[in-house]
Amino acid sequence: MAEECLVSRKKFGGKAMEVRSEMWTGLDLCSQGIKNISKSLFDMRFIRTLNLANNEIEVIPREICNLRHLEVLNLSKNKIRSIPPEIGKIVSLRELNLSDNLISNIPMEMGTLYNLEVFEIANNPLIVPFNTLIRDKKLLQFCREHNTGYPPPNDRLWIECTGKNVFYGDTVSVGTFNILSNIYATRMTYAPSWVINSEFRREGVLQEIVLYNVDILCLQEIELYSFFDFYKEQLEMRCNYDSIIYPRGRVKSVPDKKNVDGCAIFWRRSKFRLIAQFPIDFHQKVIQDTRFNTNQELLDRYGKKDNIAIGALLERPNGQQVLVMNTHIFWDPDYPDIKLLQVLLLVEEIKRVSSRHPNACLLLQGDFNSLRSSSVYKSITTPVIDFADFGDTMQHLSNQQFGDGLGLNDAYSNQDLGFTNFTPGFKGVIDYIFYGGGISLASVLSPVEDEYTENVAGLPNMHFPSDHIFLGAKFAFPNKNISQNAFGRNSRQ
């Protein structure tokens, strides 16, 4: 249903109008003698252009940040004395005109307007250093570099989960973290340059890992050089970790292999030893599988997407085995069919390995780039494969013998997680910790509170080294004499 918004008759001085978003995308209220902006205006979240020039406006309401699709804003020739910090949340802005007002100060939050191409603020009594910075066209850069006035988030705590089985033994803690490849970080121009600096972020990532100090850790977007030159040694020394890494498929073709990122698994050597590892290159599986490699339309759509997964079969001192799978699924929301295909190939590999190790518990972690409403999520958390996201291009594949879904549990299914990935253009849950094989969820790491995200445009920032957050869970492992199966419930539960 189209949004309906009412322009206040009292505030704007004209006849009240009912307007619908499909009718227009801009609003011109220039030279209307307006003194106050009606709050109802900020319910028109569909508008892209707003002209309020040449009026008598003294205050810009902080609710202006609700206009998240606004691209052009003209407030020139008014009596405005200050800019609300909330304007920095309108990251879609491309043109902003605040000329001919009474503005003396600039909020540092303006630095997050990374799409801003035209910024006019002439004929304002700007104080030092803003008057000089605007002349040298360095004002927004200055704001971006000094945008540090927001408070830190609350400490994240372990939240206990009810129903721990009395027959269970000790607990094992696990975590997953997409640490943001340095190549991708440099594209996040809404963040200060010192925030996306590779050494600054590297230390921040290390601090988070050491802080939570889990027994099994899965990392995504970790470059080969970062792994071998830094994380492997540092985490061996600080957390007593052993580790393996598997890079993206492009490592076979690019000359600068050290910058290729991949997935890595770390485990505490005092609690586990490596029995076997299982690298998975989804692209290679597609081009080698007779179900797919004769379908040119499918091959063209898949292209050279080089997403991967890595598995590790770990064994505890008591002989109990754990199959840990870490994956990074394709990112583009326009390709839900490719995401589902990659996950179905992953599901097949998990079943193949699990059939050889039927008593192993299962942990599946990573960045799945998929919401809980997706076929990807449903195919992992239910016993039935959901083919809805295959669409027309790959619908014929739903008839192939993919078998059943995994029917795993989501460690955060009972938590209001809010987000695991937060950028100016997206905020949602796409990272997961799935588990099965008789282990029982004991606790999870608490979410980042929504109140914190209301003050920032996106991650990374000075408090978070990546655009993803660290997820953690603790599991109570069954005593070894209790029968279990990776895809079924414990016999005593």
UniProtKB/Swiss-Prot annotation:
It is found in: Cytoplasm; Nucleus. GO terms for cellular component: cytoplasm; nucleus. It holds the Pfam family LRR_14. Its cofactor is Mg(2+). LRR repeats lie at residues 23-44, 46-67, 69-90, 92-113, 115-134. GO terms for molecular function: metal ion binding; poly(A)-specific ribonuclease activity; RNA binding. It is an enzyme of class 3 (hydrolase). Mg(2+) binds at residue 221. Keywords: Activator, Cytoplasm, Exonuclease, Hydrolase, Leucine-rich repeat, Magnesium, Metal-binding, Nuclease, Nucleus, Repeat, Repressor, RNA-binding, Transcription, Transcription regulation. Its EC number is 3.1.13.4. It catalyses: Exonucleolytic cleavage of poly(A) to 5'-AMP. It comes from the Eukaryota. InterPro entries: CCR4/nocturin_mRNA_transcr (IPR050410), Endo/exonu/phosph_ase_sf (IPR036691), Endo/exonuclease/phosphatase (IPR005135), Leu-rich_rpt (IPR001611), Leu-rich_rpt_typical-subtyp (IPR003591), LRR_dom_sf (IPR032675), LRR_R13L4/SHOC2-like (IPR055414). Acts as a catalytic component of the CCR4-NOT core complex, which in the nucleus seems to be a general transcription factor, and in the cytoplasm the major mRNA deadenylase involved in mRNA turnover. Ccr4 has 3'-5' RNase activity with a strong preference for polyadenylated substrates and also low exonuclease activity towards single-stranded DNA. Belongs to the CCR4/nocturin family. Component of the CCR4-NOT core complex. This is Probable CCR4-Not complex 3'-5'-exoribonuclease subunit Ccr4. The gene is CCR4.
